[in-house]
Amino acid sequence: MQRLKLDEARYEVVKGGFGTLAAAGHAPLSLDLATRLGDRFSAYREEQMFVFPGAHDAIDEFKARGVKLALVTNGAAGPQRAKVERFALAHRFDHIQIEGEHGFGKPEERAYLHAMQTLGVTASETWMIGDNLEWEVVAPQRLGIYAIWIDVHGDGLPADSTVKPDRIIRSLTELLPPERG
C-alpha cells in the first residue's frame, strides 16, 4: 500500500518524470537528484501542514460536552504519530486510530466500524468530519454515518462532483452551538 510508503512513492514519481524527460531527448538526470527532490518535497509538505483554524477550541469544547471523539487517519505509524504529538492532539481524543498501526484505513469500512466499536457508538450517532470527499463523505455515508465535509479553503465542491455531503463547513467551530449572551 503506497500511502504507507509516501517517501518511496515520491522518489518513484520523480524518477519516472526523469525517465520521461530522457525518453524525449533531454539529458538524463541523476537518481541522486531524484532523491533530493523527493526529500525536499516531503519536507515542504511537512512544513505546510497545519491544524484547521479553530480546531483545538472546537475539539476541546466537544470533549467538555462529553462527546466521544476519535481521530482516524491514514498513513504510516511513525509520521502520523509524530503529527499527533506536533499538533497536541493526543489528549483531545478518546481514540486515535492510525492506519499504519491497525493495518487498515479509510475508505475501508472496517476503519470506520473499528472506531465506532471502540467508542461504543452506532453509525446513526456518528459524525465523520474531514476534507476528503471519498474518505470522509462517500464511504462513511454508505454506513449511515452523518458526513461533514470541511471546505477549509472555501472552494466549494468540484463542479463535476456527484458527492452530496450531509453538511459543508469551513471551520469546526461552525458545529458548536451559538454562544448565549
Regions found by a protein language model. Name each.
Residues 41-48:
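Surface-exposed cleft-lining segments at the edges of enzyme active sites
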Residues 7, 42, 77-80:
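Short alpha-helical segments used as structural interaction elements across diverse proteins
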Residues 35-39, 52, 130:
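Short C-terminal alpha-helical element
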Residues 1-40:
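A metal-dependent, Asp-based hydrolase signature
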